[in-house]
């Protein structure tokens, strides 16, 4: 979920004029991170608009795009400075960030808490992150998630949800801000030191996220009962 703060820092750089949403960037093979990324499949020396990077980072959770954005925004140090300045004391980028090596070894690329990542989505929803215009576009990005198999699977498809998933071997996480018919609600689930490290849909962390999401929908919208249709899991990434 550290890609949300990276997105915010990128839009902050665009608002300051250091970057431009429509600027063309030159992709090089040296930027590739992992074999599963869409951006990593692009040919060397291809021109890519910055707007594609922000979309891929949030919608697909593309690691290559996200690390590139982290560098373009001014490195993890710049992202962390924005977080500190806006009251986020526990959310930090660790990877490729001087002084964060111990945290990187313990937590991975980044770290946050359920409260802080939920607060950050609320800040964007209330158009208070960077600027109203930037917040509006960031919120649109967050409502286009490709990863609909967990929290989103328990919410009707006709309800808009801003969300971001996260997963490493010993943790599964998701934050979601639901624009429900009777009012918004936000929640975040982050597992820690999880014993089940499988990548199957039945993973205990993902199962927990689905259960929490279903319970919250039933709680906040008791007069709008909804369940995934039989066989819906066949069409989940």
Protein language model annotation of sequence segments:
Residues 1-2, 20-22, 83-88, 107, ...:
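Extracytoplasmic
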Residues 1-25, 57, 187:
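Active-site SXXK
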Residues 1-4, 18, 43-51, 58-63, ...:
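Solvent-exposed, acidic/flexible segments
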Residues 12-32, 76, 131-134:
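Short, well-structured active-site flanking segments
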Residues 29-30, 58-61, 72, 95-96, ...:
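Active-site-proximal beta-strand/loop segments in catalytic clefts of secreted hydrolases
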Residues 46, 54, 67-126:
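Mid-domain, small-residue-enriched loop/turn segments at the edges of structured enzyme/sensor domains
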Residues 49-53, 60-66, 97-105, 171, ...:
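Flexible glycine/proline-enriched surface loops and loop-helix/loop-strand junctions
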Residues 72, 76, 119-149, 159, ...:
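Structured C-terminal helix/loop/strand segments within mature extracytoplasmic catalytic/sensor domains
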């Amino acid at each position: 979920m550290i890609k949300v703060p990276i997105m915010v820092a990128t839009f902050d750089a665009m608002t300051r004029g250091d970057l431009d949403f429509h600027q063309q960037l030159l992709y090089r093979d040296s930027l590739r991170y992992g074999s599963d990324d869409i951006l990593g499949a692009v040919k060397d020396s291809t021109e890519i608009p910055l707007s594609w990077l922000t979309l891929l980072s949030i919608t697909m959770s593309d690691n290559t795009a996200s690390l590139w954005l982290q560098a373009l925004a001014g490195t993890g140090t710049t992202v962390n400075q924005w977080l500190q300045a806006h009251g986020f004391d526990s959310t930090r980028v660790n990877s490729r960030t001087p002084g964060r090596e111990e945290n990187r070894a313990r937590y991975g690329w980044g770290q946050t808490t359920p409260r802080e990542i939920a607060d950050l989505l609320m800040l964007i929803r209330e158009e208070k992150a960077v600027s109203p215009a930037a917040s509006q576009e960031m919120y649109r990005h967050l409502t286009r998630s490709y990863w609909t198999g967990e929290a989103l699977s328990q919410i009707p498809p006709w309800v808009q949800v801003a969300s971001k998933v996260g997963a490493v071997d010993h943790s599964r996480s998701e934050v979601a801000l639901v624009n429900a018919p009777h009012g918004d609600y936000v929640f975040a689930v982050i597992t820690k030191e999880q014993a089940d490290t499988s990548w199957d849909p039945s993973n205990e962390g993902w199962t927990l996220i689905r259960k929490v999401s279903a319970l919250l929908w039933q709680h906040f919208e008791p007069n709008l009962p909804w369940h995934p249709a039989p066989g819906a899991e066949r069409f989940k990434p």
